[in-house]
Amino acid sequence: MAIGDRAMFTVLLLFIASISGFSVVRCVTDPSDVQALQVLYTSLNSPSQLTNWKNGGGDPCGESWKGITCEGSAVVTIDISDLGVSGTLGYLLSDLKSLRKLDVSGNSIHDTLPYQLPPNLTSLNLARNNLSGNLPYSISAMGSLSYMNVSGNSLTMSIGDIFADHKSLATLDLSHNNFSGDLPSSLSTVSTLSVLYVQNNQLTGSIDVLSGLPLKTLNVANNHFNGSIPKELSSIQTLIYDGNSFDNVPASPQPERPGKKETPSGSKKPKIGSEEKSSDSGKGLSGGVVTGIVFGSLFVAGIIALVLYLCLHKKKRKVRGSTRASQRSLPLSGTPEVQEQRVKSVASVADLKSSPAEKVTVDRVMKNGSISRIRSPITASQYTVSSLQVATNSFSQENIIGEGSLGRVYRAEFPNGKIMAIKKIDNAALSLQEEDNFLEAVSNMSRLRHPNIVPLAGYCTEHGQRLLVYEYVGNGNLDDTLHTNDDRSMNLTWNARVKVALGTAKALEYLHEVCLPSIVHRNFKSANILLDEELNPHLSDSGLAALTPNTERQVSTQVVGSFGYSAPEFALSGIYTVKSDVYTFGVVMLELLTGRKPLDSSRTRAEQSLVRWATPQLHDIDALSKMVDPSLNGMYPAKSLSRFADIIALCIQPEPEFRPPMSEVVQQLVRLVQRASVVKRRSSDDTGFSYRTPEHEHVDISF
């Protein structure tokens, strides 16, 4: 018996030990999650409220970081609501691949939303902060969202057509912001939406897109909506619509006691077509009470109307003043239509009350009438010259990995093993004004956050130097990959080429249409598209155009190395806009299609200019097949090739006004990717390019 007990005890100890060992292993948090949380903690100014959080190291799952919930080694919930933290959301939230719930509501978080958010969220709550800018396009890919709340911020511009793929969204709260424009048409496709709050914005147009939704609660109060309220909305349990200009505002039924449940903002109106039931419906109200309620309501309504009139009158005066100031500070580049849009957008932003900690750029009008720009805080790290000298071996020739119009780029290895890329700007390339504006440009570049843009990590201004520190992307650039005679071009399959085109298109879309004011790249070329190990593209030199001289003579000197990419309007007048970037993007797409350089003096005269040679052939199926890069070995789908050529033709049109915006280019490339599947094509001397191949030759390796 004793032996049996001892054996049983031994087995029990082994079981406990195994369980303990398992729990220890389970507590080791995924390294990418740890890094993302560390960046978030630093971006929030390392607040003491986040107990157990660390700037470096640590184990969020094993050490019970405040607000963090894990499943195994993955972080699935971040709930740091109502803790009074401030700062920004950082730039690595998208690395939290397993995160399902993010709640940072009720804090003082400011700045713009990160362009990339955790992709698999089911619940997103950013309410009651000081967030500005617009909703990032990446929300369109977050198809698992069932709850989204960004209310009580300072978000601006249009909401964006970002809900087409949201098949689970039940609650959407965009209220108490400064959104403008019409409701996005993609809202009509959200068949699961039951609660929608958009009150207290600057929205316009009709609400017809909501007519087919299964809404139970809808609040559109205090906007600029017009037209008719669709009769389909009569089944909504709670409808709040006052403060607009609807044509068919229904008459109110007999006064009744308000229910216990209150909805956010706006006065509650009975639902259209039927009466609301009071919880005490069996108890009648006397005539005197009804009369008192009516007169009391009229008195309160009169006071509210007077207050609203005074507020609106004051607001209009502020908007007029801020619009005039904003117009003076806008860049002169771009079409008149773009400039007009910027005036409207900046005016609406200027009217908002920003917290002192917000990173905004303000134009101060001096007594002499000039404008002094107050620079935003710089989010990038500041380096010393000595540390950069050590990391680059005193900027030795062996460390040079590139050279551009503003200076050379060096590979830098720091003592901790971190590898970075250092751009050493040649001060001779800058005028005095550009030197003075260097820190302002650094501030703007440090805030660019996009997965396809090389991030600025730091800078140095010691001893008159101008040095920029970038994240290192170590797999070369697209120019070398396409145009050098080695195995790298063989690895660039058709799918990879479309992937590069889509990624860089999204980067330009971000610069042109997400950033405010728009950022013109002005040096977009294959040599500035860096590739990582998975052939994801990363656009370099974004924002550097602010440092280049502004005169036509100087600009021509700066981009002489990019000849072959230049848009016709730039060659004629020196004018460069976002539409010029679209043109150069089309040239890069031609490189991806043909494998040829934009200018190649080794070819016959008729084929030296890629654009001139290729343009007449883009809509000729037979000619198109002969243009394709031979290194693809016929491995591409014919329809995808044709659509790719159609996009190129749009981008390289001679007239800039006919070129599409980058958002349209992105949409077309996304559709191309969705339809794409690689089909092996055969080419022979007798039949030429084969657009029909036997069934056994189909290879399904679509995106």
Swiss-Prot record:
Glycosylation: residue positions: 120, 130, 149, 178, 226
Membrane topology: Single-pass membrane protein
CDD domains, alphabetized: STKc_IRAK (cd14066)
One Pfam family from the record: LRRNT_2
Tissue: Expressed in seedlings, roots, stems, leaves, flowers and siliques.
Topology Cytoplasmic: residue spans: 313-703
InterPro entries: Kinase-like_dom_sf, Leu-rich_rpt, LRR_dom_sf, LRR_N_plant-typ, PRK1-6/SRF4-like, Prot_kinase_dom, Ser-Thr/Tyr_kinase_cat_dom
Mutant phenotype after disruption: No visible phenotype.
Coiled-coil regions, chain positions: none
Signal peptide region: 1-27
Residues passing through the membrane, by range: 292-312
GO CC annotation terms, alphabetical: plasma membrane
Chain positions covered by the region annotation Disordered: 247-284
Binding, ATP: 401-409, 423
Keywords: ATP-binding, Glycoprotein, Leucine-rich repeat, Membrane, Nucleotide-binding, Receptor, Repeat, Signal, Transmembrane, Transmembrane helix
One Gene Ontology term of the molecular function aspect: protein kinase activity
Compartment annotation: Membrane
Additional free-text comment from the UniProt record: Cannot functionally replace STRUBBELIG. Over-expression of SRF8 may lead to seedling lethality in both cv. Landsberg and cv. Columbia.
Protein name: Protein STRUBBELIG-RECEPTOR FAMILY 8
